[in-house]
Amino acid sequence: NIKALEFAAANPFIPVVTTKITGIARFDLLEKISLGVDLAPEEEAEYSSVLKRIDAICSAAYKTKTSIFIDAEESWIQDAIDSIANLMMSRYNKEYISVYNTFQMYRHDRLEFLMKSYEEANNQGYILGAKLVRGAYIDKERKRAEERGYPSPINKDKASTDDCFNTALRFCIDNYEKIALILGEGFVKIRQNNKIEFASFKTIETPEIDNQFELIYPISD
């Protein structure tokens, strides 16, 4: 990741690098942290090492004025990922927006979590970096929930997800002075399906906060 950041820093057409926490930390460790289970001493040391590696990446992003997108992953490890993302934002999102967390809006709890993340960022004096997407693990999430007998974290239908996505988008735009917004693949769907709704959002004109739109290559058609 650090080499990727160095490459991006030398190329004005690459403003951001994406990272998956599961590429740095063991899945089982993240799951245990998300469950709130006490870690064994060797696991504490392992997690400390993970945080140091992630901090080194985010520090490099800050120094090179490049941004890091922290991907969202499965719901049963997401609490640990969110905790890491918030920690890194609190360190590196004060003078420059270096770190973005990803919010999968197909989860019915993500709108509330987005608002809580905004409140936490305000209280701690940093800018929330928010990348909004719909989500990528829908079948896996529903299957696991059914097999293990707990309520699915996924919205009941696409319309509900669209509502959550659009409400989250409006919230971020309404608070653009304190939220650095990235829209993933959802921008295309909003542009195609909700032209009037999207056009009704306020115009963003601020040099301080960088609001961007991106398109994931596989769905570019």
Region roles according to the model:
Residues 1-221:
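Positively charged, amphipathic and often flexible ligand-engagement surfaces
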